Amino acid sequence: MSDQNKTKDYSKYFDFSDARVVSEDDEKKIIKIKGREITIYDQPNYRAGRKRKREDVQVLRPENLIPEEVANLGAGKKFLIRTYGCQMNVHDSENMSGLLLGMGFEETTETEEADIILLNTCAIRENAENKVFGEIGNLKPLKLEKPELIIGVCGCMSQEESVVGKIMEKHQHIDLIFGTHNIHRLPHLLRDAIFGKEMVIEVWSKEGDIVENMPRSRKNKTQAWVNIMYGCDKFCTYCIVPYTRGKERSRLPEDIIAEVRDLARQGYKEITLLGQNVNAYGKDLPGSYRLGDLMNEIHKIDIPRVRFTTSHPRDFDDHLIEVLAQGGNLVEHIHLPVQHGNSDILKLMGRKYTREQYITLANKIKQAIPNASFTTDLIVGFPNETEEQFQDMLSLVEEIQFDAAYTYIYSPREGTPAARMEDNVPMSVKKERLARLNALVNDISNKRNLDYQDKIVEVLVEGESKKNTDVLAGRTRTNRLVNFVGPKSAIGEIVYVKITEAKTWSLDGEIVSAPEVKAQ
C-alpha cells in the first residue's frame, strides 16, 4: 500500500473518531469502525488520480486470472450484477460475470437467490449516485436475513473518496469495494471478503495495466462491445471521468482486430468500439496509428455493422472522416457531444474548442457522409449560465439539426473545478431551460424522422418491444428505433422494414421481402 494512501484522512467527510488501527503492514491496513473490521489494500485519492505520468503501460496476458484455490468457490452459489451508467460499465460487468462463472458461480436475476450481489456504479451525475445509495439501503434487510450474503460496490463511484468514506461509516453491511482499474483482481478480493468476514477495500487511484485474456460473458449474442481504449486526459472542468477511469491507454491494434475477427466468426452482427474518449485512440502508442487506421482495418472484416462511442470534437480528424465515408460496415451514425452552444461556456467547461469550430467540424462530417444521423450531449445550467448563453445553445441545435440529443441539467461532481464555481442560476430556471431545450430537440427529431416515412430501411432486430411483446424492435444503421410486427425468428437478424409511421423518438413499420427492397 502506498504511503500516500496509508495516511489518507477521511475525517473531512465523516466522523471516524472511533476508528482504530488493528494492524498495518506494507500490503494492507486493518481498521475497526463501529465494531466492524475493514481491510484496506488501497483507497481512492483524487490527487493521485489526476496525475498523468509518462510511464509505459504494460499489456498483461495472464493464462489464468482465477487462482486454483478459488476455482470452485462458487459451486452451488449464485451471483447478481446490477449495472448503472454507460456502455463501458456494461462491458465491465461482462468481464466480472466471466470471472464469477469461472469460479463456479451461476448467474441469477433474482435478488433473493443471490449469494453475491455486485453494484457496478456510475458517478457521472448526482442522480445516478443517489440511486445506488438507495439500493445499498434496500439491500440491508436482506443482508441481516442472510449474513453470508456478500454485497460489493464497484465501478466509478468506488473511485470517489467521499463515497468510500460514506460506505465505511454508514453502510457497514457492504463487504467489498473495488474500483475500475482492478476488476481482474475480483477473485482474490472475493476470497478475502468471504473467508475474512471483514469489509475489503481495494481501489487503485493510479490506473493499472491493460489486461488481455479477461474471461467475458456476453449477454447479447448479436451485438458486442469491444473496448479499444481506457481513460481520458481531457479534464473537462465538470467531469469526474478522468479521475475515475485514469489516463488514456490504448489496446494494441492486433489485440482489437483479433477480438473483432473472433466476434465475426461467432456470427455477431454489430460491434461498438468503446472508449471514454474513443477517437483519442492510438495517441499513447508508438508511431502514428490512430482510430481512422483501426477503423480502416475493421472495415475489411466480415461483420455487418461497426459503431464507435464516445467521441471528443478535438480528436475527430480528417483521416477518420475519410475512412467513415467509405460506408460498408461503418454505419452512418455520429455521436459527437458538444455540451453547449456558447463559446464562453465551452471555455469554462474546458472543452478547448469554440462554437464555430464545432459547427465547422459538423458540416465537414455531414458533407463527407450526407446520410449520417448526428446526435449529441447537452448540459443546461452550467454555473452562471445567462439567458443569452442558453439562447446560443438553442440556436446551435437549430443550426446543426441534431437527430437526437441527450440533455441534462448540470450536476456538480466533488473534486472537479466546476464544483467550486459559484452558481447564481436557480434550479427552477435550469429546469425551465431544460424543458425548452427538450421541446426544440423533440421537434427537430420528429421532423428528421418524417424523412423516413414510406421508405424501406435496414433493421437489426434486437428483440421484443419493451412496450408490447407482440412487436419486434430493432435499429437502423443510423441508430433509429424501429418497431414492427414480425416472426420471433427474426431476432438477431438483419431485415428490411417499410416505415408506415414516423414518431418523435421511433419509427413504426412493416417487414418486407428482399424483392421489394430491390424494386425500390
UniProtKB/Swiss-Prot annotation:
Catalyzes the methylthiolation of N6-(dimethylallyl)adenosine (i(6)A), leading to the formation of 2-methylthio-N6-(dimethylallyl)adenosine (ms(2)i(6)A) at position 37 in tRNAs that read codons beginning with uridine. It comes from Shouchella clausii (strain KSM-K16) (Alkalihalobacillus clausii). Binds 2 [4Fe-4S] clusters. One cluster is coordinated with 3 cysteines and an exchangeable S-adenosyl-L-methionine. This is tRNA-2-methylthio-N(6)-dimethylallyladenosine synthase. Belongs to the methylthiotransferase family. MiaB subfamily. Residues 77-195 form the MTTase N-terminal domain. PANTHER family: CDK5 REGULATORY SUBUNIT-ASSOCIATED PROTEIN 1, MITOCHONDRIAL TRNA METHYLTHIOTRANSFERASE CDK5RAP1. GO terms for cellular component: cytosol. The lineage of its organism: Bacteria, Bacillati, Bacillota, Bacilli, Bacillales. [4Fe-4S] cluster 1 binds at residues 86, 122, 156. The keyword Transferase applies. Transmembrane segments: none annotated. Its cofactor is [4Fe-4S] cluster. It holds the Pfam family TRAM. Its EC number is 2.8.4.3. Gene3D superfamilies: Methylthiotransferase, N-terminal domain, tm_1862 like domain. PROSITE patterns: MTTASE_N, MTTASE_RADICAL, RADICAL_SAM, TRAM. It comes from the Bacteria. NCBIfam families: miaB-methiolase (TIGR01574), MiaB/RimO family radical SAM methylthiotransferase (TIGR00089). One of its GO terms (molecular function) is N6-isopentenyladenosine methylthiotransferase activity. It catalyses: N(6)-dimethylallyladenosine(37) in tRNA + (sulfur carrier)-SH + AH2 + 2 S-adenosyl-L-methionine = 2-methylsulfanyl-N(6)-dimethylallyladenosine(37) in tRNA + (sulfur carrier)-H + 5'-deoxyadenosine + L-methionine + A + S-adenosyl-L-homocysteine + 2 H(+).
